From Swiss-Prot:
CDD domains: SF2_C_DEAD. A motif (DEAD box) lies at residues 352-355. It comes from the Eukaryota. Disulfide bonds: none annotated. Pfam families: DEAD (PF00270), Helicase_C (PF00271). ATP-binding RNA helicase involved in translation initiation. Remodels RNA in response to ADP and ATP concentrations by facilitating disruption, but also formation of RNA duplexes. This is ATP-dependent RNA helicase ded1. It is found in: Cytoplasm. It comes from Botryotinia fuckeliana (strain B05.10).
Length: 683
């Protein structure tokens, strides 16, 4: 039994205790001791069995390593610079590398400090960012990878270049009204633009300013407020980004307010100097991408915040610096309530697609942001409004937000571009799918954007097209932000060349190289039609628009005819016949309700033309006149009321309001027949 259990020296009968030997080590314990460290191993770290020290002498002076002599490395003797491993000696401290600590809370450049959220303009932030140092703008190093990401390569099909038809824009009429309007610029030059911005503009392959840019650049650089109307796709984004960034490069960051510092001189609150508000997530993302492009290698740090995305990542982005903020109104109000954004430093406020923001019900949030928070007053900031249309109610809103502004109208505002070939076809609802298939087979090449009215129809139509072997995707409000971004990206790069969309994608989105827009369902508002077809024919390029029309769309029939006439397009005979059939409904867009009144000066400066506008059954009406006459609803109109020649006190209509409106200055109620100028009002 003992022999069986001996197992290489494990003797159960021996009196001397033996340690347990694991099975995988048995038979290996009787060999010679290791001779030292392997050839490629550090000998000083090799400690075989023994007294616990390495293969060297025991340290002199006792058992403690504290008494051992200083270690001397092999080779070149003692290191230079003393007993340390820095061969070049201790580094000298460069205070300019970290900004001026006294300039504001958090340090660098007075713009937020290292880790602060105010901008951190005094330090290089990495990724090719520049600095603001000693009152000068120092551009960061070039980064080839970032340049390819932002600007693409020459002739990149995913980056739309300026089209050849911008040369025709010199013939488009431009109206600039206001006091002392500056002369337009004809080239991207210094002055007025900063040299660094001009380099980024060249990287983006922009050759000449668009008409709206020719006028907006000197107006904004001159310190004036601006209300600008221009054809969609005419470069409105550059119209406000170019002057804002150019002045930022020249003047540097604003110091964070003295009361902003938290514990240890840091603040997690962002203090942007420029705020750009836009109605949709896609539009703010697009503006943010453009701002990154033109702020490349500069001290300006753009940020974007919008709903439907992870707020944590947006907060972390702001903490790395936030000088130019692009936001949707809802998410901005949320971040203000959380105490993460302050508007104290705002120098520039931009409202892009302002009419769309009011249509979507954002007016309370906009008024709170502009008037109810800590934003500087109208006299202490520059305010810019940009849109393709400016109905009268928006112009009245501008009266509260803008000061001594210049009204800029480029081309036929509220109309479409002649670069777009518009076709209107009579198609009953039951036949729309088959006609759409014929169109897609005929115009197969290029990107096609199809607009529908409902979210359900967007999904249904995209599924139908996929079943017909057409690569299609859809975008609408019920899809998550990630799904919407993925659908747009697949459409942009051509993997899904057919995109079915609701109005969420219609306004302001710059999708390059869209060749064909199909209005599968016509909108009820002609402005929406303008913005939909404006997704093609952008940046001076050409495009095709096809609209499916039937008697269910007769509410926009007259406005559609007027639009086609303005753009020198062919007018189908069935449109004129249907327009004659519906003869009794007068006035502006929207039929019975009158809407905004296309003849009421949606493209004119209301300060020059006063009230008026279409409304109701042959009504005159309008949205009031100059500030002294009150607000909305002045004028004659109403059901059967006589047309009002202007808003300067016309006789009240049968049901119309006599004056004022919304508690306006000279009395009168919004449609209150008993208030002919007295103090009564329903408001």
């Amino acid at each position: 039994m003992a022999d069986q259990l001996n197992m290489n020296g494990l003797n159960l009968n021996g009196g001397e205790p033996r340690s347990y030997i694991p099975p995988h080590m048995r038979g290996k314990m009787g060999g010679p001791a290791p001779a030292g460290p392997p050839a490629n191993l550090n000998g000083s770290a090799w400690a075989p069995q023994g007294n616990g020290y390495a293969n060297g002498p025991r340290p002199a002076g006792g058992d403690s390593w504290a008494n051992a002599p200083d270690f001397t490395p092999r080779g070149n003797g003692a290191p230079r610079g003393g007993n340390n491993w820095n061969p070049s000696g201790p580094p000298s401290f460069n205070k300019n590398a970290y900004g001026n600590p006294a300039a504001g809370a958090g340090g660098p450049g007075g713009a937020g400090g290292a880790g602060g959220a105010g901008g951190g303009a005094g330090q290089a932030r990495g990724g090719g960012d520049g600095q603001w140092r000693d009152g000068k703008h120092i551009a960061g190093p070039a980064n080839a990878r970032v340049e390819r990401e932002l600007f693409g390569i020459a002739d990149d099909p995913t980056k739309q270049q300026t089209g050849i038809n911008f040369e025709k824009y010199d013939d488009i009429p431009v109206e600039a009204s206001g006091q002392d309007v500056p002369e337009p610029v004809l080239k991207f030059t210094n002055p007025p633009l900063d040299d660094h911005l001009i380099k980024n503009i060249e990287l983006a392959h922009y050759k000449v300013p668009t008409p709206v840019q020719k006028y907006s650049i000197p107006i904004v650089m001159g310190g004036r407020d601006l209300m600008a109307c221009a054809q969609t796709g005419s470069g409105k984004t550059g119209g406000f980004l170019f002057p804002i960034l150019s002045q930022a490069f020249q003047t540097g960051p604003s110091p964070v307010p003295a009361n902003a510092a938290g514990s240890f001189g840091r603040t997690r609150k962002a203090y942007p100097t420029s705020l750009i508000l836009a109605p949709t997530r896609e539009l703010v993302s697009q503006i943010y991408d453009e701002s990154r492009k033109f702020a490349y290698r500069s001290w300006v740090r753009p940020c974007v915040v919008y709903g439907g995305a992870d707020i944590g990542s947006q907060l972390r982005q702001m903490e790395r610096g936030c000088d130019l903020l692009v936001a949707t109104p809802g998410r901005l109000v949320d971040l203000i309530e959380r105490g993460r954004i302050s508007l104290q430093n705002i120098k520039y406020l931009v409202l892009d697609e302002a009419d769309r923001m009011l249509d979507m019900g954002f007016e309370p949030q906009i008024r709170r942001i502009v008037e109810g928070e800590d934003m500087p007053g109208v006299q202490n900031r520059q305010t810019l409004m940009f849109s393709a249309t400016f109905p009268r109610d928006i112009q009245m809103l501008a009266r509260d937000f803008l000061k001594d502004y210049v009204f800029l109208s480029v081309g036929r505002v509220g109309s479409t571009s002649e670069n777009i070939t518009q076709k209107v076809e009579y198609v009953e609802d039951i036949d729309k799918r088959s006609v759409l298939l014929d169109i897609l087979h005929t115009h197969g090449a290029g990107l096609t954007l199809i607009f529908v009215e409902t979210k359900r129809m967007a999904d249904s139509l995209s599924d139908f097209l996929i079943n017909q072997n057409f690569p299609a995707t859809s975008i609408h409000g019920d899809r998550t932000q990630r799904e919407r971004e993925r659908a747009l990206e697949m459409f942009r790069n051509g993997r899904c060349p057919i995109l079915v969309a609701t109005a969420v994608a219609a306004r302001g989105l710059d999708i390059p190289n869209v060749k064909h827009v199909v209005n599968y369902d016509l909108p009820t508002d002609i402005d929406d039609y303008v913005h939909r077809i404006g997704r093609t024919g952008r940046a001076g390029n050409t495009g095709i628009s096809t609209a499916f029309f039937n008697r269910g769309n007769r509410g926009v029939c007259r406005d559609l005819i007027e639009l086609l006439k303005e753009a020198n397009q062919e007018i189908p005979s069935f449109l004129e016949n249907i327009a004659r059939e519906g003869g009794g409904f007068g006035g502006g867009r929207g039929g019975r309700s009158g809407g905004r009144g296309r003849g009421g000066g949606a493209n004119r400066d209301f300060r020059k033309f006063g009230g008026g506008g279409g409304g109701g059954f042959n009504g005159g009406g309008g949205f009031g006149g100059p500030p002294a006459s009150g607000g909305y609803g002045g004028g004659g109109g109403g059901f059967g009321g006589p047309p009002a020649p202007s808003s300067y006190g016309p006789p009240p209509g049968q049901y119309g309001g006599g004056g004022g409106g919304y508690g306006g200055g000279n009395g009168g109620g919004y449609g209150n027949p008993s208030a002919g100028g007295g103090g009564q009002s329903w408001w």
